[in-house]
Each structure stands twice: as structure tokens, then as C-alpha cells.
Amino acid sequence: MKKAMRSILVIIACCFVLNSAAQKTIDTIATKVDGFDIPIRIKLPKNTTGKNPVYFFVHGGGWNGGTATSVPPARLSTDANYLANQLGVIYVGLAYRCKGNNATFADAIQDLEASVQWFFENADTYNADLTRIGFGGSSAGSTLAAMMAQKYKNCKLFVGAEGMYNLVEHSEERSTFPSQKARELYGLATEKESKKASAFYNL
């Protein structure tokens, strides 16, 4: 009985190891800013040769979250497995400081730029083709991702879901996000700040 039990445990352990290896998801710290670790999550494609394109994903959440000691985690969207395993895309989840970190939109952009730069510097480790990169995001993350996409000449793709790209002409009658309170808390209270954070005005 004990021998059979040990065999079962060995099989389970092997399955876990193989599954973990197959997933090829890497979690690490890309940079440290003002005492905060900025994490990054990388989903590598399986069974590819040569260099692969890169897709940077910025999570949503209304710029909420974060504490006095940590930022919200880097996350992958539901399409990560398909893009990585079926299309050979390196899928990179980015993190950034939010309102709970007493941060601003400009701080978030700084975090994202630092994380992307870290990935660029480690591109050879992940067999990344930096001539083919794209950005995307959901909701509040899409607003940030749109700004990021405009910063890199090798960006070939932008995918935004339910983002806000013109914060200057925004009104709560059109959309409840971001609320006036959220704008004030995240450094978007003035027209100058809103214009600087609007992809529409940075084309």
C-alpha cells in the first residue's frame, strides 16, 4: 500500500513539473521605484525556433489597488495562452503603481517604461524580436497602453478594450470612468494633465 502511494505521489509530482515547464510562465521584478517592487509576468511560447514577437499587456481595474508596501500584480489576459502557444507570441504582463500607492498617471507611465526597458535589455534571454512589438490593455489599462504604444517606433499593434483615449473632452454623462474623484487622485485634475495622458492628443 505504501509503495503504491509513493508511486502515485511520484506521478503527481512529475505531472506538476511537466505542466509547469510546459506553461513557461516567468514571474520576476523588473524594477524598483520609490521603495516599490514593480513585477512583470512573462508567458513564453512553446516549441518555437528563432525570435518571437512581443505583446505587452497592461491590466485594468480603474487604477485602483495597491498598498503602502506593494503594487497590484502583473497579470495576463485570457488570450495569453492562445497567443503564446498557438501564434508564438511572447506575452508580457506589466504592472504599475495605482491610487492605493498614492501614485499618479505619470508615475504609472514611468513604471511601464522602466519595465519595458528591462525587457528590452533582457530580450536575448527570451528570444524576443524587438522589431515586432505590440501593446494592449483593458479598461483603465488600455488608456495607459495606448500612450505606451505611441512611444516606440517598432510598435506594430495596439489592442484596446473599453479604454478612454481623450480625457480632455471626457464627461461623466458619456462614461462614469474616470470619475472626477479618480482624476483628482491620479493626477488628472487639470486640462494640461489630462491632455498629456490622452492618446488622442499625442498622435
Residue ranges of predicted features:
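Mobile cap/lid helix-loop segments that gate and shape the active-site cleft of serine hydrolases
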Residues: 163-164, 168-202
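Short amphipathic alpha-helix adjacent to the substrate-entry channel of hydrolases
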Residues: 69-92
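Serine-hydrolase catalytic-loop signature spanning alpha/beta hydrolases and amidase-signature enzymes
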Residues: 62-70, 91, 118
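Primarily recognizes the serine-hydrolase "nucleophile elbow" in alpha/beta-hydrolase
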Residues: 114-174
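Short beta-strand element of the alpha/beta-hydrolase
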Residues: 51-62
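Short beta-to-alpha linker loops that shape the active-site pocket of alpha/beta-hydrolase fold enzymes
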Residues: 61, 95-99, 164
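N-terminal cap/lid segment of alpha/beta-hydrolase-fold proteins
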Residues: 22-49
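Bacterial Sec-dependent N-terminal signal peptides
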Residues: 1-24
